[in-house]
Amino acid sequence: MMKSFYAAATWLTLGLAAGVFYREFTKLTGNLGVESELSLMHTHILALGMMMFLIVLALDAVLTLHTRRSFTVFFWVYNAGLAVTIVMMLIRGLLTLDGKSPADTSAAIPGIAGLGHILLTVGLIALFMAIREGLGEHQERLAARQSRLQSTREATVSEG
């Protein structure tokens, strides 16, 4: 569970740093208020990084997701995909502020960003697999607890 906490904290730090970088870089270069991918990085990192891992942390506390192989796949693949996607946003944003349109730049940028999105998707599929497994075990535990409570009630009634 601590991996999810540290991932959330790391993405929080990166998200806040991205916001400061955008503000200071655009002021420094005279591009304040210019729309670019840099202006979106802050919220993307906070939502897809920090908030995602805080939600995963809560799910892990209930469903013990961290014990599953599919969760490990999710953790590393999702983080890698988010990192690739964010780096490509950074590159595209810097190029945009430099006056280059997407048509003027390499086709590799959207291609690599697409690979980042594919990694994010694979990670999310692995997360859903871990959640499904966790829900199945959680339902079994609830049914067993309900059965024990019922047995205790019946024993109490028959004694009384």
Language-model region placement:
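Hydrophobic alpha-helical transmembrane segments of multi-pass integral membrane proteins
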Residues: 1-160
